[in-house]
Regions:
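Ordered, small/hydrophobic-rich secondary-structure cores
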Residues: 1-89
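A short, N-terminal "cap"/entry segment at the start of jelly-roll beta-barrel domains
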Residues: 1-31, 75-76, 80, 94-146
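Conserved short histidine dyad/triad with adjacent acidic residue
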Residues: 16-20, 31-48, 134-138, 147-165, ...
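Short strand-coil-strand connectors
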Residues: 28, 66-68, 181-185, 208
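Surface-exposed loop/turn positions
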Residues: 28, 41, 78, 86, ...
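Short, conserved beta-strand element in jelly-roll/cupin
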Residues: 36, 47-63, 152-155, 164-179
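Short acidic-glycine-tyrosine-enriched beta hairpin
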Residues: 68-84, 183-200
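Ligand-binding loop in jelly-roll beta-barrel domains
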Residues: 84-110, 199-220
Length: 220
């Protein structure tokens, strides 16, 4: 994958009548997979013996949860957290263009989940964190010794100077836009777009006004 702005729809486009998955290859110990589903397609319910996170990216559809087959819609920009051993299938709306989402499997037994997250209830990520005057706000959603998923809100005039991270990461713009500096080049990142940082890649974030983002970091 090139280190340039992208959308998950570009990395894993929807194909009519097909369900397709593609690994993001952030790290073997934290499987991150992009799924695209054609309109009206479905994935048979299954369960994992660990916590699973789902991030809506594009289109419309729902997750089918539990033995009672409860239908839970997931919209772009929303997070759905499922406890271990939760039976889960997916169904793309038949009257739409399809559905694209990200799956993150937390294989580690020891991790910390923010108690503002309610399992089985979709939550808009950008609504979980507020802007703080003249400041950069951080909100850890979940972290373990080999990963972190965090939200950040930048007030106007703030930003991150060039630095390096100890693992591969994907930044996703949730609101506003920013200039991403990466290894000496600048890229504009708009809401709904993502950017990959490789381990130890030199990067910076310069918001163009107020800006919210998520960051998924995998350390191996």
């Amino acid at each position: 994958m090139n280190n340039t702005p992208f959308t998950i729809a570009q990395m894993r486009p929807i194909r009519e009548a097909m369900t397709i998955s593609r690994p993001a290859r952030l790290g073997a110990e934290v499987p991150v997979t992009w799924f695209s589903m054609g309109a009206g397609t479905s994935i048979t319910p299954e369960s994992y013996d660990c916590i699973t996170l789902y991030l809506g990216a594009e289109g419309s559809g729902c997750f089918v949860l539990g033995a009672e087959a409860r239908h839970v819609p997931l919209a772009p920009g929303e997070l759905l957290v499922l406890p271990s051993k939760t039976l889960c299938g997916t169904l793309a709306d038949s009257d739409g263009t399809g559905m694209i989402y990200t799956e993150i499997i937390l294989k580690k037994e020891q991790f910390t989940m923010n108690n503002i997250i309610k399992a089985g209830q979709p939550t808009a990520l950008k609504d979980l964190i507020s802007y703080e005057e003249g400041s950069i706000a951080n909100l850890d959603i979940v972290h373990a010794d080999n990963m972190k998923f965090v939200l950040m809100a930048f007030d106007e005039g703030t930003g991150l100077t060039p630095h390096r991270a100890p693992g591969n990461a994907i930044l996703t713009a949730l609101e506003g836009k920013a200039i991403i500096g990466y290894e000496g080049r600048d890229y504009e990142l708009n809401a709904g777009e993502s950017f990959r940082f490789d381990k130890n890649g030199l990067h910076s974030v310069t918001p163009q006004g107020k800006f919210k983002m998520s960051l998924l970091l995998v350390i191996e």
